[in-house]
């Protein structure tokens, strides 16, 4: 009888453990204590620090690509380090806790009021380690955008983001019960929190839009560029990690602008200027180093990356690519008259689709046109690769736009900004006439947002630049970013952002473009805009926008040196 009673007890226990329809079972073990990063909507100025803290928690290793952190693959993350908990609180005091996977920044579950909800197809790792002291239930849809939008009934392009939307989303997640049946408010709330947490951690462009909306207590709907970023984070990460050391992508990242026009991005520099991508999904890692370097000499050795994921390794080699090269004044590197003869001059010409502007970047360090090598001699020319010293045909492309011949240490230079100008090799003074971009030869028109989310503003030649509130379509705040590294007044592209000299506290003004060292700028992954000639960065003087002064200054890491480009100011 005692045995029968015990068996009945075990049967009843098993049945009770199933709970209501949709409830989950898991192995009852002591769960790990996962790190937590919280955000309270009543502290609007804490949104940026909240995202920095979240990024620090999900980045477990020191693997980087072009100075951007790369998340660890699943095979290298233990269950005890797999998740980060993110409690979100709205002004009404409602709190919901998200569980975020450190492998991909996905929201995989959420919990509130003693209940937790997992997406359809949740894994044992998730169920056995997350919210085990709650009643676990499984939703009848997955966490991807297609599934969530299907539940809502329309796309996220129509769903506002901002403090009001986030507050409502938190309440929707907190009050949801599986028995209620209506998943539309829940799915809508999930679309809001995923974009305002995970996507903002992936892209500083998205962070800026949301941070501005929180500061201004306003709402906005995602533009098509933002949505295309969200849809292409994986492909961006892959292209960046497989790129040649100079940032040349093996393929093309397909984005859309705000008017739904296609944008084809073929190098890291342009992709970063468009998206300010902040974190990469793991794809490829260098074999010989844990990061790619921007240093021209170190970059001579092309590092062959390896794909690690799913318990296997797959070699992911750097490949040859064929691209145009844009330089001073937006002119392209061109073989004179397209003549296929040894010694023919390499010059500047208007960018077009001509064959004589298509250069192949080989993994042996050569740059070739129809098989002939870009070659250094008394001038820069094309020549049979097999009949000249190999060191005369080697080049290193850096992400700052410098193209260096390692043997001489000299860099590719355009002596004049004129069609037909023969290229030369000169000492590197980091001048704009020595700046180049591979692929993406058209200038990018953008706003430049800095301290207190205000926009860089100009008032014509021989005047200072300063910060003012951003105003959509204000021509004084529109800039054209050229492949030569210049920042030009979009309404008059003969005018360049210029440092008066190259010493700390020198003012930044607008002058005629001359291809000089004080007119070349680099948008860095740490958020600064540096002048490589001076080795100083753009700085809002004394962190005081009322002074109306932007200066050169040594890097400090302070907010008054942080900048971001955006084609759609918030």
From Swiss-Prot:
The precursor is processed in two chains, A and B, that are linked by a disulfide bond. A small truncated form corresponding roughly to the second ricin B-type lectin domain of the B chain, TrSNAIf, can also be produced. N-glycosylated. Its EC number is 3.2.2.22. Disulfide bonds join 284-316, 332-351, 373-385, 455-470, 496-513. Glycans are attached at residues 40, 62, 140, 232, 492, 526, 544. It catalyses: Endohydrolysis of the N-glycosidic bond at one specific adenosine on the 28S rRNA. GO terms for biological process: defense response; negative regulation of translation. This is Ribosome-inactivating protein SNAIf.
């Amino acid at each position: 009888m005692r045995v029968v009673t015990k068996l009945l007890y075990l049967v009843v226990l098993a049945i009770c453990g199933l709970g209501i329809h949709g409830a989950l079972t898991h192995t009852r073990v002591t769960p790990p204590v996962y790190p937590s990063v919280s955000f309270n909507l009543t502290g609007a100025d804490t949104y940026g620090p909240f995202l920095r803290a979240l990024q620090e928690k999900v980045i477990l290793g020191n693997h980087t690509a072009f100075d951007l952190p790369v998340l660890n693959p699943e095979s290298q993350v233990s269950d005890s380090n797999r998740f980060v908990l993110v409690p979100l609180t709205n002004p009404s005091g409602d709190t919901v806790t998200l569980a975020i996977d450190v492998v991909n920044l996905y929201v995989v579950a959420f919990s509130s009021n003693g209940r937790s909800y997992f997406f359809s197809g949740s894994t044992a790792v998730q169920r056995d380690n997350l919210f085990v002291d709650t009643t676990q239930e499984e939703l009848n849809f997955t966490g991807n955008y297609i599934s969530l939008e299907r539940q809502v009934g329309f796309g996220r392009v129509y769903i506002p983001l901002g403090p009001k939307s986030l507050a409502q989303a938190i309440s929707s997640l907190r009050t949801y019960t599986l028995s209620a049946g209506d998943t539309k408010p829940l799915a809508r709330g999930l679309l809001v929190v995923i974009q305002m947490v995970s996507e903002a951690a992936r892209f500083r462009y998205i962070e800026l839009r949301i941070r501005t909306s929180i500061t201004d207590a306003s709402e906005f709907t995602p533009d098509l560029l933002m949505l295309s970023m969200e849809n292409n984070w994986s492909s961006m990460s892959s292209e960046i990690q497989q790129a040649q050391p100079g940032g040349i992508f093996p393929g093309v990242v397909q984005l859309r602008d705000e008017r739904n026009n296609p944008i084809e991005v073929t190098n890291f520099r342009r992709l970063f200027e468009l998206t300010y991508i902040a974190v990469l999904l793991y794809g490829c890692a260098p074999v010989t180093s844990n990061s790619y370097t921007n240093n021209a000499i170190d970059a001579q050795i092309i590092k062959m990356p390896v794909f690690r994921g799913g318990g296997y390794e797959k070699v992911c080699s750097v490949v040859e690519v064929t691209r145009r090269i844009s330089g001073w004044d937006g002119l392209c590197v061109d073989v004179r008259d397209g003549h296929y003869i040894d010694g023919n001059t390499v010059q500047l010409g208007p960018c077009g689709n001509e064959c004589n502007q298509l250069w192949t970047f080989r993994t042996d360090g050569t740059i070739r046109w129809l098989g002939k090598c870009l070659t250094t001699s008394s001038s820069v020319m094309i020549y049979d690769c097999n009949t000249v010293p190999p060191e005369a045909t080697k080049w290193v492309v850096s992400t700052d736009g410098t193209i260096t011949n390692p043997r001489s240490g000299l860099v590719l230079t355009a002596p004049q900004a004129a069609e037909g100008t023969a290229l030369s090799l000169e000492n590197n003074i980091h001048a704009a006439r020595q700046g180049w971009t591979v692929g993406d030869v058209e200038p990018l028109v953008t706003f430049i947002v800095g301290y207190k989310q205000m926009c860089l503003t100009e008032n014509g030649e021989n005047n200072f630049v300063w910060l003012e509130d951003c105003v959509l379509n204000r021509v004084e705040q529109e800039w054209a970013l050229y492949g030569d590294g210049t920042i030009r007044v979009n309404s008059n592209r003969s005018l360049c952002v210029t440092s008066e000299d190259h010493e700390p506290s020198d003012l930044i003004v607008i002058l005629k473009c001359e291809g000089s060292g004080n007119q070349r700028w680099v948008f860095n992954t740490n958020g600064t805009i540096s002048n490589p000639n001076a080795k100083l960065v753009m700085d809002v003087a004394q962190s005081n926008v009322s002074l109306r002064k932007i200066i050169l200054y040594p890097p400090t890491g302070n907010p008054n040196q942080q900048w971001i480009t955006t084609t759609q100011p918030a």
